[in-house]
């Protein structure tokens, strides 16, 4: 069986993950002056974000390509110990755990894909398919969507639009079936793993750009907490997760953050927001250490 055929068999399952994940980086864009000097391909990852609608609010979440661009630009070596152990999925017995770890494995798959780790990616895709089937969320996609992804797999712009549309399909499916909590948990798991990977890389390289990108997660974290808060009393698992994220948010209060708002351009049909605002972040080594410890503790609770 060819590798393309194998990936086609599993790719549909991961699509549920990739488009929902606030993977690794913040929504902040760069200045127009800096952007004009770059090619369209380089500009896309840092200026495209997706909109997640929750109740009557729209939350911008980073595009899946921001992390890939940053890590590739830095030529950071692959670390096989960063990703969550794949065998853990057999121990997830509740929908809460399955949804959170679906998000985590989706982020891990993105990390593996950066380094073209095809054998590992296939294994993670298999587990993701298993979990998504158990959660009953694979039904929101059809064959035409998978065919479109396959045809456009090397076109970042087209893929981002497809993923945004697929988010709309799954979001609608979860809402109709009164399962919005599952979507929020997938988002949470993906964000937690994203920040965990960034902190591991930031501490290992002491790269200032990466460390400051970690600091930029302050506002996405606030958004995530707001999305999860309605479920605080749904279960002890929810309240523990939210309390941990709130505790983490207090650590971000020590990050120096300035923000200059500029009107964004919004593509309502595809739920894409082009960020034009500018931000400046300074994160100390102390806050990097405290954030790293707290996000690792939250992650360990999720994957354990």
Give the label of every model feature segment:
Residues 106, 110-113, 132, 136, ...:
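A structural signal for well-ordered alpha-helices, especially hydrophobic packing surfaces
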Residues 36-148:
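N-terminal Sec/ER secretory leader and immediately downstream segment
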Residues 122-127, 144-147, 185-186, 211-215, ...:
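Short, charged, amphipathic alpha-helical segments
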Residues 155-242:
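Extended amphipathic alpha-helical interaction segments
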Residues 2-14:
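Bacterial N-terminal signal peptides that target proteins for export
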Residues 23-26:
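C-terminal motif of bacterial Sec signal peptides marking the signal peptidase cleavage site
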Residues 28-31:
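Bacterial signal peptide processing site
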Residues 232-304:
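A cross-kingdom marker for long, charged
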């Amino acid at each position: 069986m060819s590798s393309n055929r194998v990936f086609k068999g599993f790719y549909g399952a991961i699509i549920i993950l990739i488009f929902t994940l606030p993977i690794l980086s913040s929504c902040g864009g760069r200045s127009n002056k800096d952007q004009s000097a770059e090619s369209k391909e380089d500009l896309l990852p840092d200026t495209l974000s997706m909109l997640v609608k929750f109740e009557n609010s729209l939350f911008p979440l980073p595009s899946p390509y921001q992390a890939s661009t940053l890590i590739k630009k830095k030529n950071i070596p692959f670390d096989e110990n960063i990703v969550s152990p794949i065998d853990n999925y057999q121990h997830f017995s509740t929908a809460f755990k399955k949804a959170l770890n679906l998000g985590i494995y989706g982020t891990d798959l993105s990390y593996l894909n950066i380094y073209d780790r095809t054998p590992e990616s296939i294994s993670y895709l298999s587990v993701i398919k298993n979990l998504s089937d158990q959660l009953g969320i694979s039904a929101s996609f059809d064959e035409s969507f998978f065919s479109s992804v396959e045809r456009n797999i090397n076109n970042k712009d087209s893929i981002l639009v497809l993923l945004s549309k697929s988010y709309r399909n799954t979001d609608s499916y979860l809402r109709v079936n009164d399962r919005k909590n599952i979507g929020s948990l997938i988002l949470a798991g993906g964000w937690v793993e994203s920040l965990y990977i960034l902190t591991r890389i930031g501490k290992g390289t002491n790269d200032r750009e990466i460390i400051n990108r970690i600091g930029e997660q302050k506002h996405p974290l606030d958004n995530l907490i707001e999305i999860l808060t309605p479920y605080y009393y749904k279960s002890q698992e929810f309240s523990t997760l939210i309390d941990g994220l709130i505790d983490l948010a207090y650590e971000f209060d020590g990050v120096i953050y300035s923000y200059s708002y500029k009107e964004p351009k919004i593509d309502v049909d595809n739920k894409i927001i082009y960020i034009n605002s500018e931000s400046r972040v300074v994160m100390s080594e102390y806050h990097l250490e405290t954030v790293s410890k707290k996000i690792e503790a939250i992650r360990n609770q999720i994957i354990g």
